[in-house]
């Protein structure tokens, strides 16, 4: 599994590779606090690694040995507290949390999580199916059900809310989301096996995800792999990338304009309202 980091002033670039008993881990999520990078690999092994930013030492800090383990994302709320999540085990989402700067991780018991439907899972969508904002957390699902799992207290209590996004097929549902603040959010996805279908694939919430309204139904892009608000723009400007190209909205997602034919991009990261990195 390859990883690396760079500084925008070009003062330092670093790349490396991690092996697990000669196996190359498949990384699906990356997060950081001030001192360390954290990498989560999907399965066989499902492991969280910590990389020291100064001396570049690598430490395996968590391993899920459940044969059904498959991890999709990792984020940090603050310097001390972080969350990683994966596909269901024992009827509930897999959620692990750290409260000590990533030194130890504890799995949330299924009794404290909403029950998953058979065939419902989360997608490993370039780390954008797990969103944190302040103390708030959202996890996206698809398959038989396309729902949003929500916590207002950094993963201690959870609720699940239905969405109108297309669902009922193994590769359909919510793949990506972003929240402008703790109330206004957007979800996107669709049917990965019918990527030109632009119906029921994007929706907006103004109440933290408790209810959702479809946006531009039957218009704009089809399947979206990543959607993001432009920061510091009042929650009005939004960008989506996926196999149909790059799309832009300047009216909270009611209308979309194609601004690039690049179909090879999978994820977006805004540095500020002017600079964005797309991969």
Predicted segments — roles?
Residues 114-160:
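Loop-centered beta-sheet repeat module
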